[in-house]
Regions:
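Conserved small-residue-rich beta-alpha loop and adjacent elements
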Residues: 96-167
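N-terminal Rossmann-like NAD(P)+-binding subdomain of aldehyde/semialdehyde dehydrogenases
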Residues: 1-109
Length: 168
């Protein structure tokens, strides 16, 4: 059975997905994923992913500028292209189709289900691109995600996480 990380974490409120401790973030992600799995159908996930994509596209240049300025890595123009690539091309719910396989031994049905809370790290080289890609993939699958961001990109990652949480 699940045991909460801490009693305090049960009532903690993050700042649009940003928390003071990893325990608080994991607890919030666990509770959010359970509610997400129980209360959101595939079409609801599609709506959320669409909102994330639209919001990200509006902020692609800002994300690129913040990333280059904070990390000192990469080229602004390339960061815009990379952000747009993950926003427009990361597979979403369209990959989650039920398959039926029949053969001599009977029928097998393959249906994807959520894993739960997923932990992810972000590299300093592509912090916002990684967050966007992972969020689209993981939310499409009915999961939640907790990011441990690279310290040299923490402000741009904070902005990206909060932007995404505001979009949904």
């Amino acid at each position: 059975p699940y045991v909460p990380v801490s009693a305090a974490a049960q009532t903690v409120q993050g700042d649009y997905g940003v928390f003071d401790t990893m325990d608080q973030a994991v607890e919030a992600a666990y509770l959010a994923q359970k509610a997400y799995q129980a209360g959101f159908q595939l079409r609801d996930r599609e709506r959320l992913i669409k909102s994330i994509r639209e919001t990200g596209i509006k902020n692609a240049e800002k994300l690129a500028r913040m990333s280059v300025d904070e990390t000192g890595l990469g080229r602004y123009e390339d960061k815009i292209l990379k952000n747009m690539l993950v926003l427009e091309r990361t597979p979403g719910t369209e990959c989650l189709r039920t398959e039926a396989i029949s053969g001599d031994d009977g029928l097998t049905i393959v249906e994807h289900s959520p894993y739960g809370v997923i932990g992810a790290i972000t590299p300093v080289t592509n912090p916002t691109e990684t967050i966007i890609n992972n969020v689209i993939s993981m939310l499409s699958g009915g999961n939640s995600v907790v990011f441990n961001v690279h310290p040299s990109a923490k402000e741009v990652c904070r902005f990206a996480v909060q932007m995404i949480n505001r979009a949904i």
